[in-house]
Amino acid sequence: MSDPEIALALVGFGNVGRRFLRLLDEAADRLDFRWRLVAISTRRHGNVVDPAGIDPARAIRTVEAGGSLAGRDTTRQERSGIDVIRQVTESLADEAADGQLVVIETTVLDIDDGEPATAHVRASLEGQAHVVTTNKAPVAFAYDDLEGLAETVDRVFFFEGAVMDGVPVFNLVRETMPAVFVDGFRGVLNTTCQYILSQMERGVSLDAAIADMQARGITEADPSLDIDGWDAAAKTAALVNVLMGGAITPHDVTRSGIRDMDETEVRDALTHGRRIRLIASATRHGGRLETRVEPELIDASDPLATLGPTENALYLHTDLLGDIGIVQRSSSLTQTAYAILSDLTQISRRLREL
């Protein structure tokens, strides 16, 4: 059987989206599918749709040079992501019907209501496209609705890159833990806060630690979502919704960040053999879920206390296997891009089985 060809439409074309296209090229001899790029939708660089195929390298060069993908066609410049999704699902209706169209959603998290990412996923599924996203919002705000829609239209909604980059959290449970009940979890899920707290243990102020990360290009210009605990809350909601059958949003998570922490108290904890970490957790009490993101003072013997400045970890509490630990030693664009590739490979295998 020849390798299936998958048409790819990218909604969002920032660092992750561009790294993903480069990864496809770098891993070409390891892929079990063929692909062509048929659409790109961006917020700042316009949009382009071409069912015959778009040159990925040229698109990357254009965006990184600050140019517009739309060229001189201002109508393409002004269209929304939803408009592009609808155009591509209509113009490639035959491929969508055959399950060979995939929309890859990599826009940034909007913590208020999860839009427009959630609408992007919904419109893609309604157009019979499979969806892969690295955005936490659709999973954290509308997982049940979107997963139900995916089942109705016989398409997949994958999101391995939404939590811990490319580390296979969701695939681990879905593919290798049949009949196992996840009744809670606890982890360090935000690299920015982990790095800042590690620096504060050395006497560096929060503001100086943030400035250092920004200078290194490893945090956003505005790190509020990280230091106020919203990023970890969105990841907590996503994990609860998928692994524990919850139906919550990030706003349901009891949350406090590290904005008001002082380097003195962080150093004092270390002096007394303890450490402060931003911990995300979920526990089930009968029929009630308790979810939290907050700085915790933990003993040096706690596995989460041993994590380095750029390390994350998640411990799943299960009924049959006890506690299962997943540790991420570092995070990078390549790992997030790999999560998309991993999900695409799952879709390719599905096509081979048809």
Which residues are covered by each model-predicted region?
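Rossmann-like NAD(P)H-binding beta-loop-alpha module
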Residues: 151-219, 230
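General beta-strand structural signal in soluble alpha/beta enzymes
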Residues: 40, 102-105, 132-134, 157-161, ...
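Rossmann-fold NAD(P)-binding glycine/threonine-rich loop
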Residues: 108-127, 134-165, 170-173
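Substrate-binding/catalytic subdomain of NAD(P)-dependent oxidoreductase enzymes
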Residues: 199, 210-306
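Catalytic, metal-anchored helix/loop core of enzyme active sites in primary metabolism
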Residues: 184-186, 212, 218-223, 281-283, ...
